[in-house]
């Protein structure tokens, strides 16, 4: 996951949480709903990127182990 992807997903999560809170305080159900959606989207994007990072780490570990066995 690139740094910009991490920043964007965290930003979506934070902005969404703020919108959700403001929508709740102002009784603006559309803003609250949009905020909840944006926050959830940011969380999902973060989890997807975390899985990609772990898969990439696993790939490197398997490759290192295979290289060690060849050696």
UniProtKB/Swiss-Prot annotation:
SUPFAM superfamilies: Hypothetical protein YjbJ
A Pfam family assignment: CsbD
Annotated segments matching region Disordered: 20-46
Family to which this protein belongs: Belongs to the UPF0337 (CsbD) family.
Protein name: UPF0337 protein PPA1427
